[in-house]
């Protein structure tokens, strides 16, 4: 049986403690069985939508959807999929801001199960540790692969990095388009949603806060 990595456990426990974990239940069922159950329910949904499941283009849709849900777009619900994290001692004594911009985000709104997508900017000021740059992208991707709220997603990435890097000096900015607003309801084709999380020096130091805000303004100009 696979076990969670220490980093996955640390992050999950931190989120639970702060009430920031997704509303996930314990379901000790094999992925293959889950996919079979989802496929069965998807057949019922499509039937109720008056779709002909014997048509060539729809015949394998329930199976595709089940596989997509479990293995792809909702794979972040399982901490066994938490990325392997490389934390490196800050031997170079880096004390300036490190920023990764234009991180692609594709997630699913948990209210309507429809996509929202956009870009994230992640900054931190190291203390004793630094993190491999690609690991930041992978953490963002992991938490994006869930039924989500943008506000929660922002806070989850924020707290995960604070926990792994053992520093409060983390800042997150996400700009996203929500298709539950664009493709249904009000049908607003142009609005975007911004969310921000600031910690440590990003919150208390005006010049550092200004530098980060300038970075995201430049990034989105």
Swiss-Prot record:
The keyword Disulfide bond does not apply. Zn(2+) binds at residues 109, 112, 180. Keywords: GTP-binding, Hydrolase, Metal-binding, Nucleotide-binding, One-carbon metabolism, Zinc. One of its GO terms (molecular function) is GTP binding. Signal peptide: none annotated. The keyword Signal does not apply. One of its GO terms (cellular component) is cytoplasm. Its EC number is 3.5.4.16. This is GTP cyclohydrolase 1. Belongs to the GTP cyclohydrolase I family.
């Amino acid at each position: 049986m696979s076990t969670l990595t220490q980093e996955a456990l640390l992050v999950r426990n931190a989120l639970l403690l702060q009430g920031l974990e997704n509303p996930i239940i314990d379901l000790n069922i094999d992925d293959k069985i889950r996919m079979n159950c989802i496929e069965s329910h998807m057949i019922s949904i499509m039937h109720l939508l008056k779709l002909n499941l014997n048509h060539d283009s729809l015949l394998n849709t329930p199976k595709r959807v089940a596989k997509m849900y479990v293995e792809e777009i909702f794979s972040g619900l399982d901490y066994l999929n938490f990325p392997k994290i490389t934390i490196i001692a800050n031997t170079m004594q880096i004390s300036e801001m490190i920023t990764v911009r234009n991180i692609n985000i594709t997630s699913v709104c948990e209210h309507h199960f429809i996509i929202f997508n956009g870009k994230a900017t992640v900054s931190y000021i190291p203390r004793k540790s630094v993190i491999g740059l690609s690991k930041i992208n992978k953490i963002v991707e992991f938490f994006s692969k869930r039924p989500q709220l943008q506000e929660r997603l922002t806070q989850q990435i924020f707290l995960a990095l604070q926990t792994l890097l053992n520093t409060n000096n983390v800042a997150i900015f996400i700009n996203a388009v929500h298709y539950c607003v664009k493709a249904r309801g009000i049908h607003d084709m142009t609005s975007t949603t911004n969310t921000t999380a600031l910690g440590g020096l990003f919150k208390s130091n005006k010049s550092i806060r200004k530098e980060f805000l300038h970075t995201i303004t430049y990034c989105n100009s």
